Amino acid sequence: MAKIIAFDEEARRGLERGMNQLADAVKVTLGPKGRNVVLEKKWGAPTITNDGVSIAKEIELEDPYEKIGAELVKEVAKKTDDVAGDGTTTATVLAQALVKEGLRNVAAGANPMALKRGIEKAVEAVSAALLEQAKDVETKEQIASTASISAADTQIGELIAEAMDKVGKEGVITVEESQTFGLELELTEGMRFDKGYISAYFATDMERMEASLDDPYILIANSKIGNVKDLLPLLEKVMQSGKPLLIIAEDVEGEALSTLVVNKIRGTFKSVAVKAPGFGDRRKAMLGDIAILTGGEVISEEVGLKLENATLDLLGSARKVVITKDETTIVDGAGSADQVQGRVNQIRAEIENSDSDYDREKLQERLAKLAGGVAVIKAGAATEVELKERKHRIEDAVRNAKAAVEEGIVAGGGVALLQASQVFEKLELTGDEATGANAVKLALEAPLKQIAVNGGLEGGVVVEKVRNLTVGHGLNAATGEYVDMIAEGIIDPAKVTRSALQNAASIAALFLTTEAVIADKPEKAAPAGAPGGMPGGDMDF
C-alpha cells in the first residue's frame, strides 16, 4: 500500500491536532464537576462514562497524521490505567500541556534532544518530591476517601474500604452485576475455587444443595481417578480414622465415582469428589497452592507418587470445607504458615517478572486465594447503561484504593503536582535543558486549571491562589472553597499522580523528537455503481 510522508513542523503539527482532539474530549470529565461523555455503540444502548481511557479508546480520526497523534495519547491513558487504575484524564491533560509548550519551543529553534533531557530530569525530580510528600494510608477512612473520589460516590468508597479491611491488601476484590438495586458485599473466608461437586449425590444439605465436611482429609491428585482398586487402600485408611474425605482430582469417574456415591448414600463413608480447577500448567500450580494451604502433597507420577501407595501423611486437612455445585471453599487449611508465606513470595516474584496481563491477573488471583481472601461487590442499577457505567467506576476505584495502600496518598485536585514544582528551584539546568524543565513546570498547572474550568472558575486565578497557599492546601472544586485537602479527604494515590506524569512526559518527549511521520495513503472511495434495471425506463414508446 502507498504511503504518505510529512516532515518537520508539518509532521509535528499533524500529530498535535490529533492529540488535541482526543485530549479535548477527555479533559471535560476531570474533577468533581467534570461532565460525562456519551459513546455510540454499533449494537445496543450507548455508553455514558467519565472514564478517560474508555473515551480515548473510542476515538478514531480520519486524517492519517491526526490518527497517529491520537493513538500516541491513547497509549498514555492506557498505560496509566494499567499501572494505577486511575489518573487517565490527568495523564492526558499533562501530555497535552507538555506537548503544546514543547512544540512552541521547538518551533522557536530549541534543540528537541536537549528539551527531552530537560523534561526527563524535571519529571524525575517531581516524582521523587511526590513520593516524599506521600503519607501512608493508615485508616479505613482514608481508603474510603480515595475510592470515593475515583468512583464519585461515597457509598462505593465505603464498601471498597470495608472489603479491603476484610481481605487485606493482597486480597482480590471482584465486581459482579447484580439483579437487584444497590450494592452488596459478599466475603469469602479461606480459599475458594470455581469447581463444585462432580455428582449432586454428594450434597449433605439437600435444601441448599451443598456439601459440608468438618475436619476432613483432603486428597489432591493431578490425574484422573477411574479404577476403584487404586483408591481402595487409601479409602480403608481414611474410614478407619473416622474422618470425611475431600478428593480434588483432574476427574473422578467410573467405578471410583460410583463406589464413593454408594457409600455416601448408605451412610457408610462421607466423601465428596471435586474436579481440579484450571487447565494444564495452571492446574498444576493451583493444586500445589491447595497442597501447601492444607499441609498435603500433590499425588502425581511426575514426582514418583502413586495413588495406590498413598498414605494418610500425604493428605491435607482443613477445619471445614463447603462445596456447592459451582464452587469449593476451604476454610482454615492446616498448612504451615512459613510454607504458605514462601509460596506467596514465589507468586509475587512471578507477577513482577510476567509480561502478560492475563498471566499477571491469574497470578494475582492465586496470590489472593493464599494470602488474603476474596470479596465480591455486587452492583445493581435501573438500566443496563447505568449498570455498565457503575461497574466500570467500581473497578477503577478498587485499583485506585490498592494504589493508595501501595505508595501512600498526596493532596488531590491537581494540588500535589502544582506544589511539587518547588523542586525546580534546586534544579541546576542551563540552555535548552532548562527550557524543557520549564515546560514541565507549566504543564504541572494544567490539571488544576482544568478542574477549575470544569467547575466554572477562572483557571489562572485559581492556580496563582493555590501556589501561595500552605503545602497541602488547595481548591475543593465541589464547593469552591480553599481547604486542607488531606484533612477534607480530597486525596489521590501517589502512584496514580506519579504514573500520570511519567507516562505523559514519555509521550511528550516522543512528539518533540519526531522529525518525520509515515502513514498509509487514504484510499479514494470507489465511484457508486449505476442503478440497476433497463435503460430508458421512463420513456414512452
From Swiss-Prot:
Biological-process GO terms, alphabetical: chaperone cofactor-dependent protein refolding; protein refolding; response to heat
GO cellular component: GroEL-GroES complex
Disulphide connectivity of cysteines: none
Record localization: Cytoplasm
Gene Ontology molecular function: ATP binding; ATP-dependent protein folding chaperone; isomerase activity; unfolded protein binding
Pfam family, one: Cpn60_TCP1
Signal peptide boundaries: none
Nucleotide-binding found in the keyword field: yes
Binding site for ATP: T29, L30, G31, P32, D86, G87, T88, T89, T90, G413, N476, A477, A478, D492
Keyword set, alphabetical order: ATP-binding, Chaperone, Cytoplasm, Isomerase, Nucleotide-binding
EC number: 5.6.1.7
Chemical reaction(s) catalysed: ATP + H2O + a folded polypeptide = ADP + phosphate + an unfolded polypeptide
UniProt key word ATP-binding: yes
Root EC class: isomerase
NCBIfam families the record matches: GroEL, PRK00013.1, PRK12849.1, PRK12850.1, PRK12851.1
Family of this protein: Belongs to the chaperonin (HSP60) family.
The protein's assembly and partners: Forms a cylinder of 14 subunits composed of two heptameric rings stacked back-to-back. Interacts with the co-chaperonin GroES.
Function: Together with its co-chaperonin GroES, plays an essential role in assisting protein folding. The GroEL-GroES system forms a nano-cage that allows encapsulation of the non-native substrate proteins and provides a physical environment optimized to promote and accelerate protein folding.
Official protein name in the record: Chaperonin GroEL 2
Phylogenetic classification of the source organism: Bacteria, Bacillati, Actinomycetota, Actinomycetes, Kitasatosporales
Gene that specifies this protein: groEL2
